[in-house]
Design a protein with these regions (language model features):
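Non-catalytic pre-domain segments flanking phosphatase-related domains
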Residues: 1-44
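Helical "lid/coupling" subdomains associated with nucleotide-phosphate turnover
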Residues: 3-4, 59-62, 78, 82-111, ...
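N-terminal basic/disordered segments at the start of proteins
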Residues: 40-66
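Short acidic donor-binding loop at the edge of a beta-strand
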Residues: 44, 170-173
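A short acidic Gly-Thr/Ser loop motif
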Residues: 49-54, 175-181, 260-264, 346
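Short acidic/polar active-site loop segments enriched in Thr and Asp
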Residues: 53, 114, 338
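N-terminal glycine-rich anion-binding loops that anchor highly charged ligand groups
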Residues: 65-77
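Conserved glycine-centered beta->alpha loop in an early N-terminal alpha/beta scaffold
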Residues: 119
Length: 365
């Protein structure tokens, strides 16, 4: 679920050709030619996150000690569909990704983006044809994707969410439930800077090699019985156990959970009885154990058609949301924190903060 526009125009065949001029990517982060965009008003930065399930873009400009979003895009593309079974990105998934990336390229061009970082995560890490896919994106779209490792993914998610850490808390357990992997990060109280958002203080992290897409494909996401749900929880719990043992219960004093993912924003939307997704109400929302349990029980009582009909779920997430709940449940059982703060932010915001800090836009380098 996302509060951003889901553009879905038909692709002009001409857009399948790489654009003339410079390409965006990790190795081309400098200023772009002056004729690339007419939307001025300070330097524009772009952060793109191509995940197993979603393609997401944020374009922003520095504003005060943070930044202002000037354009955004989010589309569920299921790039990693079938990768866990076949080991390859399918042609249909590649076409969906290229269509979404073409829209992102045009948005960056229209906003006159001067610096960008375009990351790809688990689907491209795991697929044997990931390099071939990236070469095709460079050729057809003109974008150079950077495949990041799991530690970088965890760090960027933490950087993007640090502003939601309760300043009265000793720290937080951040989790990011993705399509193909899920990250858990122990955060100590954040460190204030001379300018810009606070810096995350990471005590430890782990990346689990599964997410909502891989778990739903393995167990089934359409008809989820209580036994199937518990099997999903048990599989995730076994992967979490070593990390939970390392960071035992004593560390939970003064800690809250901080969740970023479509799973937790969906749960928050259901909890708030939203008829239409509203990021302003979801981002930063607090939920306690009783409220989380009530939503999960409600979702488990729904059949597939009920989930499709829910304005907070819809057809794009109806077969994935219970897998996400199972991952969340395994995390909660391992780390029984009484409060959860919901974040509709994460990797892209972390990328933007990192680039702007490197450029010294908040008065430091």
């Amino acid at each position: 679920m996302s509060g951003e526009a889901r553009d879905n125009p038909g692709l002009d065949p001409a857009l399948n050709r790489a654009p003339e001029g410079p390409r965006w990517g990790r190795r081309s982060l400098g200023r772009l030619d002056s004729d690339l965009g007419s939307d001025r008003g300070g330097p524009s930065y772009a952060a793109l996150d191509l995940g197993t399930n979603n393609c997401r873009l944020l374009v922003a400009r520095p504003a005060g000690e943070s930044f202002r979003v000037v354009d955004a895009f989010s589309r569920i593309i299921r790039l990693g569909e079938g990768v866990s079974a076949l080991g390859r990105l399918s042609e249909a998934a590649i076409e969906r990704a290229i269509a979404a990336l073409t829209i992102c390229r045009n948005k960056m061009k229209n906003k006159g983006v001067s610096r960008a970082r375009l990351i790809a995560t688990e689907a491209c890490r795991a697929a044997e044809n990931g390099a071939e896919f990236r070469a095709r994106v460079a050729e057809e779209v003109g974008l150079e994707l950077e495949v990041i490792n799991r530690e970088t993914e965890a760090t960027l998610a933490a950087t993007g969410c640090t502003m939601l850490l309760d300043p009265q808390a000793e720290g937080a357990l951040l989790f990011d439930i993705g399509g193909g992997s899920s990250e858990l990060v122990w955060l100590d109280r954040s460190q204030k800077c001379n300018g810009g958002p606070p810096l995350p203080q990471i005590r430890g992290w782990v990346s689990l090699p599964l997410g909502v897409v891989t778990l739903a494909e393995r167990h089934g996401g359409v008809s989820v019985t209580p036994a199937i749900y518990e099997a999903m929880v048990s599989e995730v719990a076994a992967l979490i156990a070593p990390f939970a043992h390392e960071h035992a219960a004593a560390a939970l004093r003064g800690i809250h959970m901080l969740g970023t993912s479509g799973t937790v924003t969906t749960i928050a939307g259901v909890h708030l009885n939203l008829k239409r997704y509203d990021r302003r109400r979801v981002d930063g929302c607090w939920m306690d154990e009783r409220e989380i349990n009530a939503v999960i029980e409600r979702l488990l009582s729904m059949n597939y058609q009920d989930r499709v009909a829910s304005p907070c779920i819809g057809v794009e997430r109806a077969d994935l949301v219970l897998a996400g709940c199972a991952i969340l449940e395994a995390i909660r059982r391992a780390f029984p924190c009484p409060r959860l703060r919901v974040a509709d932010r994460g990797l892209r915001e972390g990328i933007l903060v990192q680039m702007m800090r490197e450029d010294g836009v908040w008065g430091e380098h």
